[in-house]
């Protein structure tokens, strides 16, 4: 009974999603930026707006933005005028973010921005593609267990069995594409779990991680509003595509 109560306390499957987004921006110019995050795409709902002042060549960010997982979303970034080039406004638009891709940062970005990325993370103790499975990692470690990527309870990596005392045989799961063979309990009262392949989230899926995941990476679009027939604005627009300086940063 005690073991059942302990398992029940650290592993609960619920229908609600728990996670947040962090957006980071960088520019060579001083900019006043408005960031808008909304659920859905064609008829956005639950909009949230944030104001951000960017200093030249410094990274600014908005963090702890609550998001609803399992649904597409929309990120809009509007910046103030860049008078030097007669640019009135530039809008970055990224649609259909999904938790299959936890970090979004394209290789290139559009001036006046020199860096743009956003990262999506589950809240503490929440797991799964939609952050909708609860498993207390800290408590799991106290009983020599771990929470799997999908939010189920299992043995520490490399072990399985009723007491997690047996080494995982090298050829047990036949995982492909960097997948790991780990133990997983099907429910809170299970005594002996099964061995499954834990795939690279957002990259591969399937029983053996043999299938490449669907490409959920959203397209980032830029729209420039400038003085009509401005030669400077045209030059700016034609040379506005630059390397994204935040593309290779680690997640927060």
Swiss-Prot record:
Keywords: Developmental protein, Disulfide bond, EGF-like domain, Notch signaling pathway, Repeat, Secreted, Signal. Disruption phenotype: Causes adjacent vulval precursor cells (VPCs) to adopt altered cell fate; phenotype exacerbated when combined with simultaneous RNAi-mediated knockdown of apx-1 and lag-2, and further worsened on lin-15 mutant background. Severe vulval precursor cell (VPC) fate abnormalities, vulval defects and failure to up-regulate lip-1 expression, on an osm-11 mutant background. InterPro entries: DSL, EGF-like_dom, Lag2. It is found in: Secreted. One of its GO terms (biological process) is Notch signaling pathway. Gene3D superfamilies: 2.10.25.140, Laminin. This is Delta-like protein dsl-1.
């Amino acid at each position: 009974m005690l073991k059942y109560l302990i398992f029940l306390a650290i592993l609960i499957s619920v229908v609600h999603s728990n996670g947040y987004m962090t957006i980071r921006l960088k520019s060579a110019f001083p900019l006043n930026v408005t960031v808008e995050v909304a659920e859905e795409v064609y008829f956005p709902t639950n909009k949230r707006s944030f104001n951000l002042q960017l200093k030249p060549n410094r990274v600014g960010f908005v963090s702890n933005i609550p998001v609803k997982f399992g649904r597409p979303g929309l990120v809009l970034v509007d910046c103030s005028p860049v008078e030097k080039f007669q640019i009135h406004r530039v809008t970055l638009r990224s649609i259909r973010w999904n938790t299959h891709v936890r970090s979004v940062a394209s290789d290139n970005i559009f001036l006046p921005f020199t860096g743009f990325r956003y990262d999506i993370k589950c809240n503490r103790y929440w797991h799964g593609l939609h952050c909708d499975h609860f498993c207390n990692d800290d408590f799991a470690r106290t009983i020599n267990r771990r929470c799997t990527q999908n939010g189920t309870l299992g043995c520490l990596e490399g072990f399985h069995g009723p007491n997690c005392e047996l080494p995982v045989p090298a050829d047990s799961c036949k995982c492909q594409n960097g997948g790991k063979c780990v133990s997983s309990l099907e429910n809170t009262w299970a005594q002996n779990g099964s061995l499954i392949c834990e795939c690279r989230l957002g990259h591969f899926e399937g029983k053996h991680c043999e299938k490449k995941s669907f490409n959920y990476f959203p397209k980032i679009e830029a729209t420039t509003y400038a003085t009509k027939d401005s030669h400077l604005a045209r030059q700016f627009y034609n040379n506005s595509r630059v390397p994204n300086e935040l593309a290779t940063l680690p997640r927060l």
